[in-house]
Structure formats: C-alpha cells, structure tokens
C-alpha cells in the first residue's frame, strides 16, 4: 500500500473510520536505545546494561524505553501519510495511551493507524488518529492510543 496523499480537509474527512495505513517495520537496536538514553538522561539498567539484563531481567535482554517507542510515532506516521497544502502541523495531545508490553532490543515495530475523528476548527483541521505500535510476532501491541494533530491548511 502506498502513502496516502491528502490535499484538503474534505479529502482527509472522507477517510473517517478507515484504516489510513501501516508503516514499514523498524528494528529497535541497542544503539538507538543508548542514543535515546543519552538524550533523555534515562540510563536505567533495563535499557542500557546488556550483561545485567541477560542475568536479571525477566526478558533476558535490554528493553526500549516506552517513550522511545512513542517518539518513533512521527517517523512511522510520515511513512503512511503525506498532507499537502498546509502551513504547519502541530502535535495537540494524546488520549487513552497505554504501554501494552515492552519492546525487547532487536525487535521490529510498525505503526497501524485509523482516522478516529476529524473536526474543522475555523480552518484548522484537528485529526484524531487511533494508533497501535505493533511488535513483530506479538499479539499485544507495544503502545496504543489516540494521537491528535492540528493541520493548518492553506
């Protein structure tokens, strides 16, 4: 499935209730986790100490930070949709966000999306995107919720 191209509010609204798309699989490796730990100053051993995690963690491996998983949402969202004729895009908020299970280092994740709700607020398009970040080979998602974005159409 190719990237969904949206050129106006009406085109976006026509997809209400529909799956918008699925991103490519993305591997979450230890280098990415370490970079995130450095950026956020969160060096908890379950994320960065490979040897200790092998011995002491119930996963027998390090795991990605939950917020690292969340932070990959914009990258994967960009693989799914191209919204044209906008001045800017602003993150508005998150609702019903839940971490279902950790992403074990080396796992592959992808984003699955559906247009949950859409409103025209005096020319600003507020879209609510139901999302799941799936882990390859797992039934339960790593993360799910509703992400709200404001698209300022020209």
Regions found by a protein language model. Give the residues of each.
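Hot-dog-fold acyl-thioester-processing enzymes
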Residues: 2-90
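Short, surface-exposed secondary-structure edge patches
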Residues: 60, 100-101
């Amino acid at each position: 499935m190719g990237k969904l191209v949206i050129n106006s509010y009406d085109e976006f609204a026509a997809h209400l209730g529909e799956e918008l798309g699925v991103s490519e699989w993305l591997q979450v490796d230890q280098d990415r986790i370490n970079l995130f730990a450095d950026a956020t100053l969160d060096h908890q051993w379950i994320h960065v100490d490979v040897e200790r995690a092998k011995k002491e963690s119930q996963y027998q491996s390090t795991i990605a930070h939950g917020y690292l998983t969340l932070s990959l949402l914009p990258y994967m969202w960009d693989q799914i949709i191209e919204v044209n004729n906008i001045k800017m895009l602003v993150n508005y908020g998150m609702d019903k966000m839940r971490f279902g299970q950790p992403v074990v280092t080396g796992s592959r994740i992808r984003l699955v999306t559906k247009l949950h709700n859409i409103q025209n607020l005096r020319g600003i398009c507020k879209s609510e995107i139901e999302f799941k970040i799936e882990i390859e080979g797992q039934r339960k998602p790593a993360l799910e919720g509703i992400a709200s974005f404001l698209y300022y159409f020209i």
